[in-house]
């Protein structure tokens, strides 16, 4: 059957999210993957994360009394070129479509920070402590910014428009809410196979989007782009219906052991032994379970009690286990047990 080309490939049964000390950094771990798929998916997701997620950025600035970016401002320690470099690093979250105009006015002495900007609507400055410039005694500055939404990097020459007022300076815009993405691929075990891939993506955002959502958005973009290459109707649903009508065992065996509310120790032992479904568990004998590292008699009794409540026990034989397309069957029956 042609659908076996994709249905018999192993799919990740575990997605984990690991927070870092920096709240804008998140690691996403997916395993197991077919050998080679870690590199394929890691590279694709990294490129999409860096290039294709939409965000907000300042596209132009107008400083009162300044005609061009090579000027200096009396009483301001930084020249206009340095101020523009600082402006590029202001991180903004804005749900509404741009362009929007925002203003900052301040008198010296003191430091002009991103948090001094008067925002509009739902706009939020994500790094309010970021320094824009430093004012001496008696100095005064007024700047007006244009904020727009978009994706990727846009050079300053594309932020120009014909009826721009004199003194409006277009600047380079980096719309992406993603600062940095890295990935690594390691070997992982599934059953007796030792060379499946484990993919770890580490994402640093500017705070406009969290890492978990960013990965979901990137995966959705990739899914949408690849869908145009699928030139046939998906037979998966028909296949599942055909199999479920001929199911020869209790559908409760398709329930995952994670849902049994076992103690942490027992759950970790099952996880380390790659026991995913109840159908996997009940085929184990007591002696096999006791040979599992860190698995003792107390954990064994706990599992036996839980299975007994379901009318099951260890050491059962199921001739049709594991069924073909087990993940789809589990989803089909998840509301029935």
UniProtKB/Swiss-Prot annotation:
It holds the Pfam family RNA_pol_A_CTD. GO terms for cellular component: cytoplasm; DNA-directed RNA polymerase complex. Residues 249-337 are annotated as: Alpha C-terminal domain (alpha-CTD). The keyword rRNA-binding does not apply. GO terms for biological process: DNA-templated transcription. SUPFAM superfamilies: C-terminal domain of RNA polymerase alpha subunit, Insert subdomain of RNA polymerase alpha subunit, RBP11-like subunits of RNA polymerase. The N-terminal domain is essential for RNAP assembly and basal transcription, whereas the C-terminal domain is involved in interaction with transcriptional regulators and with upstream promoter elements. Belongs to the RNA polymerase alpha chain family. DNA-dependent RNA polymerase catalyzes the transcription of DNA into RNA using the four ribonucleoside triphosphates as substrates. This is DNA-directed RNA polymerase subunit alpha. It comes from Bartonella bacilliformis (strain ATCC 35685 / KC583 / Herrer 020/F12,63). The lineage of its organism: Bacteria, Pseudomonadati, Pseudomonadota, Alphaproteobacteria, Hyphomicrobiales. The gene is rpoA.
